[in-house]
């Protein structure tokens, strides 16, 4: 994982993140705007792909693995540290993870079969879906059409972390 700015990296699943300057700004933004849709854009080091998508992550941290959307784009809900506290169950909360370009090298690209253009296309497709969705219902219907297996995985993870009746995003 990386920070888009040049501050030291702190994971959003670490309480220290929300005590940092940027974390406090994020919480202020959420409290002020009370969004219906909230999306965090992250990048990750492709060499951590398996670690981020493995159930070992859940066993070690209690946080479900990120879900493979396709073309090395990963998706999940937002940190459980803020999901239940700062948002209603009706808020659509997503974290989108994209490989950090500056961490890519020919060896990593070959090892993981990474295609930058396909990854960008997948990322843009989901961002456009989020931007064009006027309601949770519309978003859910479109996600089921395009990413059915990922939605079922998200539902399973939401139940593990938030309980049986909690939505998958």
What residue ranges belong to the model's regions?
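Extracytoplasmic/secreted cell-surface and envelope-processing proteins
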Residues: 7-11, 48-50, 105
């Amino acid at each position: 994982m990386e920070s888009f700015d040049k501050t030291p990296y702190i994971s959003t699943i670490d309480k220290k993140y929300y005590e940092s300057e940027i974390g406090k700004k994020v919480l202020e933004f959420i409290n002020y705007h009370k969004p219906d849709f909230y999306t965090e854009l992250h990048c990750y080091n492709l060499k951590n792909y398996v670690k981020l998508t493995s159930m070992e992550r859940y066993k070690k941290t209690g946080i479900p693995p990120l879900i493979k959307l396709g073309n090395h784009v990963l998706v999940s809900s937002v940190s459980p540290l803020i999901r239940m506290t700062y948002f209603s169950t009706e808020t659509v909360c997503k974290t989108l993870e994209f490989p950090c370009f500056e961490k890519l090298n020919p060896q990593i690209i070959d090892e993981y079969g990474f295609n930058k253009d396909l990854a960008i296309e997948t990322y843009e497709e989901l961002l456009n879906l989020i931007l064009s969705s006027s309601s949770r219902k519309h978003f859910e219907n479109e996600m089921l059409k395009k990413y059915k297996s990922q939605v079922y995985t998200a539902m399973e993870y939401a139940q593990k972390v938030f309980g049986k009746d909690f939505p998958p995003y």
